[in-house]
Amino acid sequence: MVLKVKMGDIGVAKSPESIETLLGSCVAIILYDRGKKVGGVAHVMLPKSRNAAEKNPGKYADTALPELLDRMTKLGARKDKLTAKLAGGAAMFKCNSNTIDVGKKNIEASKEEVRKVGLRIASEDLGGDIGRTITLSLKDGSVIVRKGAELKTI
């Protein structure tokens, strides 16, 4: 079964399921506990929330990661056993010098939040100007990244 994560949402599951999301300028924060075969994906739309009581914590990098960790530990994952991966953050629109590159800001914020909680980023597929679809296999923690006709594993 494939759990589809929508924009600004968080999905967690156990093996044998997989988790999938479609990304443009958004960034997927992907966590996996190999021992428990528990994984999760946060589909981050923006770098920072305006308040701590945000109704949709998956939308922002600063609120998505704590919520993702909480949901995964409830399924049996251990923070000290987690592997982190990142994908997305494409520059989907041509920007002039006065325009904020949301993809770049999402990448920076997501990396910072992962570092803040003491996790190491094992692999990533970030930036560029093409959207991508990612699929996290909860059997082994592999992440398939599809960009157009290109397919790779991170």
Swiss-Prot record:
- Root EC class: hydrolase
Q: According to the lineage, what is the superkingdom? A: Archaea
In the Enzyme Commission scheme, what number(s) does this protein have?
Answer: 3.5.1.44
Q: Which organism is it from?
A: Methanococcus maripaludis (strain C6 / ATCC BAA-1332)
Q: What is the recorded name of this protein? A: Probable chemoreceptor glutamine deamidase CheD
Catalysed reactions, semicolon-separated:
L-glutaminyl-[protein] + H2O = L-glutamyl-[protein] + NH4(+)
- What HAMAP family does this protein map onto? CheD (MF_01440)
| Function summary | Probably deamidates glutamine residues to glutamate on methyl-accepting chemotaxis receptors (MCPs), playing an important role in chemotaxis.
The UniProt GO MF terms for this protein read: protein-glutamine glutaminase activity
Q: Which InterPro entries does this one have?
A: CheD-like_sf (IPR038592), Chemorcpt_Glu_NH3ase_CheD (IPR005659), Cytotoxic_necrot_fac-like_cat (IPR011324)
Transmembrane region(s):
none
Q: Which family does it belong to?
A: Belongs to the CheD family.
Which residues fall in a coiled-coil region? none
Please list the GO biological process terms of this entry: chemotaxis
- Please provide the record's keywords in A-Z order: Chemotaxis, Hydrolase
